[in-house]
Amino acid sequence: MKYPLYLGAVAAALGLALAGCQPAARPPTVGSSASVPGPSSSELAAIIQTAVEDRNGTVLDTPPVARLATRQMTAAYRSKRERDLAVVARSKAGFKSMGFWYTSFSTTVTVESVEVSGSEASVRFKELTEEYQASTANGPSSVPSGYSLPQTATFRASGDGWQLDSIAPTVHGGILPMSVVEG
């Protein structure tokens, strides 16, 4: 009856030998997909909606205070937004010198897809905006002008959650709304 005892000893030795072949367990590295909780589509959509409304508000005669929190955007997004403000201000001044200005707008963002890869996310969405104008000749108009613009927003995970890194049109060329500065 030494045979079953012999098999048990061989199995134990084999188990110990194979255990030595396993890689050492390490904690996940910062930025790996294991350390970043995935964003919800509604969380990203809310950030996009606020960012697009902030951007569109820059064309108004009296722009509202931006509502997107600093912790919700990367330094790269903040930098581009600051550069874009100067371009929009020049366009707005030219528009006003011709006797026109925007008085209000209404924007709806519809998320079409969300892709998450580790600490980065990409959101394809469509913006539908109606803008109301006024002119020195006719006063305020009750008929809006409008546009629909497909865009992509990118996000990066950070210690503060998911931060907006960029928003760009997915179709290039053509005439863009005054608030959208490409490049």
Say what each PLM segment does.
Residues 32-104:
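Core segments of small alpha/beta cavity-forming domains
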Residues 90-138:
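Surface-exposed, charged secondary-structure patches
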Residues 135-183:
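Low-complexity, intrinsically disordered terminal/linker segments enriched in charged
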Residues 39-40, 112-114, 158-161, 165:
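Terminal and domain-boundary regions
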Residues 22-24:
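Bacterial signal peptide processing site
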Residues 1-9:
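Bacterial N-terminal signal peptides that target proteins for export
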Residues 17-20:
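C-terminal motif of bacterial Sec signal peptides marking the signal peptidase cleavage site
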